[in-house]
Structure formats: structure tokens, C-alpha cells
């Protein structure tokens, strides 16, 4: 799989159907938590990843495996049925993209944006709160922030929200200065 987190058309349709069902049954937050948990399990387990990706397993085997994982993890019945349906229809390869699409739909429904914050060193709780407040006031939406440390930016901060990048890193400032000096 090239990028299993990108939703295919089929994955998008499965996500949309599940999203509508969760709204109808008032289970949005619970099902979203289940799917995020499954995404983390797949990221951590090569065996689970192999089950989803390998053509050596039949659709029926994949459905049984995912249903067993859902039962063991205590997922909602709706989540378990969704996983079984996707796998039994031969779409296990679209599952991670469907999860990504579902999480995005849920965030949009709740008025939340996902922001990735990159800094040269770890942020304190107060700094993180300040970044969260700044992003919220700039975009008018509640941010869900994930942080990453990248010493190569030297200092400052980079904030990515969707396709927008706010780059206030020392590395980018130095690169701009270097470019300006070369042109002079």
C-alpha cells in the first residue's frame, strides 16, 4: 500500500456511511475512540498490519480477525459490525483510509481542526496552551494539537493546520536570509 491513510473513494463512502450511523445512534465519540484505538493497534502490530494488507488472507479470515480484535478490545457493536463489513466486502485495504476520513468528518462536525506543532525542543504545558489559544483565535475553531520535536529547525515553531503551514522557525529565517544574500 502506497499511503494507506489516504481515503480511497470506497474508503470515503464507508466512512460517510459509518459517520451517518453514529450520528443517528448518538455514538460518534465512542466509535471515533474505537477507530483511533484500532489505528494505534495497527501502527504497533506488524501482524495486524499484515492481516489487513496481505492477499494471502481471505476476506472471511480478515473479517474474523478484525471481529476478534474488536471483541477483545471491547469496541462498540457498531464499530465491530463496521470492521466485519469492510473486511468481508474485500475492502480491508481501504480500512485505514476510511478511519482517517471518519476522524476528519468527526472533527469537522465538532468544529475542531487538527494542528501539528513542530518545535526544536519539547513544549511546556503553558507554551502548549499558548499555542492552542493562538491557533484557536487565528482560525476560529478549537484545535486538536499533536506535537513533534525536530531539532533541525533550530528554534521557533512550525504549525501545520490542514494544507496551511505557519513557519516561524529559525531554520526558515536563516534560509531566507541565505537566499537574500545570494541574490545580492
Curated annotation (Swiss-Prot):
It is a peripheral membrane protein. GO terms for cellular component: plasma membrane; proton-transporting ATP synthase complex. GO terms for molecular function: proton-transporting ATP synthase activity, rotational mechanism. Its main location: membrane. It is found in: Cell inner membrane. InterPro entries: ATP_synth_OSCP/delta_N_sf, ATPase_OSCP/dsu. Pfam families: OSCP (PF00213). Keywords: ATP synthesis, Cell inner membrane, Cell membrane, CF(1), Hydrogen ion transport, Ion transport, Membrane, Transport. The keyword tRNA-binding does not apply. Belongs to the ATPase delta chain family. F(1)F(0) ATP synthase produces ATP from ADP in the presence of a proton or sodium gradient. F-type ATPases consist of two structural domains, F(1) containing the extramembraneous catalytic core and F(0) containing the membrane proton channel, linked together by a central stalk and a peripheral stalk. During catalysis, ATP synthesis in the catalytic domain of F(1) is coupled via a rotary mechanism of the central stalk subunits to proton translocation. F-type ATPases have 2 components, F(1) - the catalytic core - and F(0) - the membrane proton channel. F(1) has five subunits: alpha(3), beta(3), gamma(1), delta(1), epsilon(1). F(0) has three main subunits: a(1), b(2) and c(10-14). The alpha and beta chains form an alternating ring which encloses part of the gamma chain. F(1) is attached to F(0) by a central stalk formed by the gamma and epsilon chains, while a peripheral stalk is formed by the delta and b chains. NCBIfam families: ATP_synt_delta, PRK05758.3-2. This is ATP synthase subunit delta. The lineage of its organism: Bacteria, Pseudomonadati, Pseudomonadota, Alphaproteobacteria, Caulobacterales.
Amino acid at each position: 500500500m502506497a499511503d494507506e491513510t489516504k481515503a480511497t473513494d470506497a474508503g470515503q463512502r464507508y466512512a460517510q456511511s459509518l459517520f451517518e450511523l453514529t450520528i443517528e445512534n448518538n455514538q460518534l465519540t465512542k466509535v471515533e475512540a474505537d477507530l483511533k484505538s484500532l489505528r494505534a493497534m495497527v501502527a504497533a502490530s506488524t501482524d495486524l498490519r499484515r492481516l489487513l494488507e496481505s492477499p494471502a488472507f481471505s476476506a472471511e479470515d480478515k473479517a474474523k480477525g478484525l471481529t476478534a480484535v474488536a471483541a477483545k478490545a471491547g469496541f462498540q457493536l457498531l464499530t465491530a459490525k463496521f470492521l466485519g463489513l469492510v473486511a468481508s466486502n474485500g475492502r480491508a485495504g481501504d480500512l485505514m483510509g476510511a478511519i482517517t476520513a471518519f476522524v476528519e468528518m468527526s472533527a469537522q462536525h465538532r468544529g475542531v481542526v487538527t494542528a501539528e506543532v513542530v518545535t526544536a525542543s519539547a513544549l511546556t504545558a503553558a507554551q502548549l496552551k499558548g499555542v492552542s489559544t493562538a491557533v484557536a483565535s487565528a482560525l476560529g475553531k478549537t484545535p486538536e494539537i499533536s506535537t513533534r520535536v525536530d531539532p533541525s529547525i533550530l528554534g521557533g515553531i512550525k504549525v501545520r493546520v490542514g494544507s496551511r503551514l505557519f513557519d516561524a522557525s529559525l531554520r526558515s529565517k536563516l534560509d531566507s536570509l541565505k537566499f537574500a544574500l545570494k541574490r545580492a
